[in-house]
Regions:
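Bacterial Sec-dependent N-terminal signal peptides
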Residues: 1-23
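Short acidic, Pro/Gly- and aromatic-enriched capping/linker segments at domain boundaries
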Residues: 21-26, 247-267, 503
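Polysaccharide-binding surfaces and accessory modules of carbohydrate-active proteins
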Residues: 22-37, 45-244, 260
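N-terminal structural segment of carbohydrate-active enzymes
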Residues: 28-39, 47-52, 66-68, 75, ...
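Short Pro-Gly-centered flexible turn/kink motifs
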Residues: 32, 92-98, 264-283
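Conserved, mostly hydrophobic/aromatic
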Residues: 32, 143, 269, 313, ...
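Aromatic-lined carbohydrate-binding/catalytic grooves of carbohydrate-active enzymes
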Residues: 304-444, 453-458, 475
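Active-site neighborhood of glycoside hydrolase catalytic domains
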Residues: 369-376, 382, 386, 407-568, ...
């Protein structure tokens, strides 16, 4: 009898081990967090855990099955799915089962786990990628979708990430705002139902809400206490975060491109890659989470993240559009006297048939205005070099004024609706970057400037309009792809610029802080937080952005805004970020100028 019992115990143990081997547990760890998946008896992938790092196998083995990791449309789930596909035969469903997974080293200290899922009825493959940066406690995730059906399938939803949490309470911190009023922090509890943060603006996508959030677990986290999950999407276009609490008080977070008006026709054999979603978990408050992002960005994501930044003097508030060569040469001398590294020439230097004397005309015609700059940009670069400083230049190459030669010659390059009156934002329209010819033109703006003036040392790349009049002459019957292909076209241009001019730093700007994502910051060394430079209000704006971005990535200038405050206070606030000046130095008192000179020297 004892022998039979022992045999039965051994048999059951072996059976359990074999079953466990058939149903893998996939562990993804950073130094202080864990994300655990397991394959269930039905062959589907489930997220069992997300939170503080689990160090013992016994803890992992006793985790519950959890919730399906990447929920599909059309099956038994009752809430928001991560993916929705329409097959060739009209079937709108997808059932994903585990196929395989692998973990590999990407670089020293960075690992990637790839989980492959497939539909058992249709030849559709979905790969979930998880890249870990252990020391910084950052996980990057994205999704790849492909198929082998005879004709293109239609993608209606295609999330970068789906995460599940099961806690008593959830508190969302969002960062909403508007022009000159960016990154306002507000907290709210999440209860049954759905909360959506999204944008449909296209080019100037983050004007009302930026692509990041904080989520406190169980109680509202403070700077140094509490559990918090912090996430951001690397996408310079329409995004959507969906937070849905279900009938069991379980929360799903779906992050990715906003699928609004963006059904995507995916041909067989082509891989649709979603943007990257980055997140970190902290058990020690929001401050630790923000420092995780700062450390990671400097080491891995931000262009020249470990390099110093150039201080500068911008001419905008001193001149606006009213300047000539003589006046600018004087300002270059002022910049040198201040001690900054660079003089930055802002808007107003280009176009001849329709000279850029205001924001109503000239945008798109990137030749120097002969009346203002008879000797071109080259003369200004020479003068800056003589003074021992660098020269930088403002451009807005993705945009066009209807009153321009570019618009007259290439209206087919412009996003605009047929048979409709045009609606303008800041008197301009957006060029169609889904069109390869337009991509060549935009790259050519930078390339021509650099070819003719190789000592130009910096670009301020602006983007002042969202997409209006939404129609692409180039895409024709594929209008649903415009919001996506337009952003991909921007990236194509930026990659070419970075490859040809790797040592030229650039500032990302969009009427203030309406562009601020980590995919764009692969190509830019810094971004402009806000056109609001009132130092009191700037403190709050900079605090909001600092939750995600390191100080060296955020530009802040000393200006005449709120001149009731002292120059010292304005300079101190600007010095919290990447320091610049945008003020008429000749209007300063002698002691104020002296203080600024000392501040620049100390900053450098």
């Amino acid at each position: 009898m004892k022998v039979r019992i022992l045999f039965l115990i051994c048999f059951l143990s072996i059976t359990c081990l074999l079953n466990a081997a058939d149903k893998p547990v996939i562990q993804i760890h950073t130094d202080n967090s864990s994300l655990i998946f397991r394959v269930a008896d039905n062959g589907r992938l489930y997220q069992s855990y997300l939170g503080k790092k689990l160090n013992h196998e016994a803890d992992i083995s006793h985790l519950p099955q959890g919730t399906e990791a990447y929920i599909t449309h059309g099956m038994e789930d009752y809430f928001e799915p991560a993916i929705h596909i329409l097959h060739n035969d009209g079937n709108p469903s997808l059932l994903l089962k585990y196929v395989s997974h692998e973990t590999k080293a990407v670089s020293q200290g960075v690992n990637e786990t790839i989980i492959t899922l497939g539909d058992d009825k249709y030849p559709v493959t979905v790969k979930l990628h998880y890249v870990t940066y252990p020391a910084e406690d950052i996980i990057k995730t994205y999704t790849e979708i492909s198929h082998k059906e005879k004709k293109p399938v239609v993608l209606h939803q295609y999330a970068s990430s789906m995460l599940h949490l099961n806690r008593a309470k959830y508190y969302l911190t969002e960062f909403s705002g508007d022009w000159a009023h960016e990154a306002n922090i507000s907290d709210q509890p999440l209860e049954f139902g759905k909360k959506v943060l999204d944008t449909k603006l296209g080019a100037r996508a983050n004007m009302f809400t930026p692509p990041f959030f904080q989520l406190s677990l169980d109680q509202l986290a403070t700077e140094n206490c509490g559990e918090v999950l912090v996430g951001t999407l690397g996408w310079t276009g329409n995004f959507r975060f969906t937070f849905e609490v279900d009938n069991k008080n379980e929360l799903r977070i779906i992050s990715g491109i906003n699928p609004y008006a963006s059904e995507y026709y995916l041909p067989a054999g082509v891989v649709f890659r979603t943007p990257d979603f980055y997140f970190t978990y902290s058990a020690n408050g929001k401050g630790k989470a923000s420092r995780n992002f700062h450390d990671w960005a400097r080491r891995y994501q931000l262009k020249d993240g470990d390099e110093t930044r150039m201080t500068l003097l911008n001419n905008w508030e001193a001149t606006y559009f009213d300047f000539n060569e003589e006046k600018l040469i004087g300002l270059i001398g002022d910049a040198a006297g201040l001690g900054v590294d660079m003089f930055l020439l802002d808007d107003g230097w280009f176009a001849n048939k329709y000279p850029r004397s205001s924001d109503h005309q000239g945008l798109g015609d990137w030749d120097e205005t002969a009346d203002k700059l008879p000797n071109g940009i080259g003369r200004l670069v020479e003068e800056a070099t003589k003074k021992g400083i660098k020269f930088g230049l403002w451009i807005e190459p993705e945009m066009v004024n209807p009153k321009s030669e570019l618009y007259e010659k290439h209206k087919d390059w412009v996003i605009h609706l047929p048979n409709r009156d045009e609606y303008y934002f800041r008197n301009q329209l957006v060029l169609d970057l889904s069109n390869p010819k337009v991509q060549d033109f935009v790259f050519g703006v930078v390339d021509k400037i650099m070819t003719e003036n190789p000592d130009v040392a910096f670009f301020k790349w602006d983007c002042n309009s969202p997409i209006t009049n939404i129609y692409s002459p180039y895409l024709k019957d594929k209008q649903g792809q415009l919001y996506i292909d337009h952003v991909r076209g921007i990236y194509n241009v930026l990659k070419r610029v970075k490859e040809k001019y790797p040592n030229v730093p650039m500032m990302l700007c969009s009427g203030g802080g309406a562009r601020c994502d980590y995919e764009a910051l692969k190509y830019f060394t810094e971004f402009w937080c806000s056109d609001n430079t009132d130092p009191v209000e700037r403190l709050f704006i900079q605090w909001g952005f600092s939750q995600f971005f390191p100080a060296k990535a955020m530009c802040a200038h000393v200006t005449s805004w709120n001149s009731r405050t002292s120059v010292k206070f304005r300079t101190d606030v600007a010095s919290m970020c990447k320091l610049g000046f945008d003020i008429g130095l000749k209007d300063m008192k002698a002691d104020e100028l002296t203080y600024c000179q000392e501040a620049v020297a100390n900053y450098k």
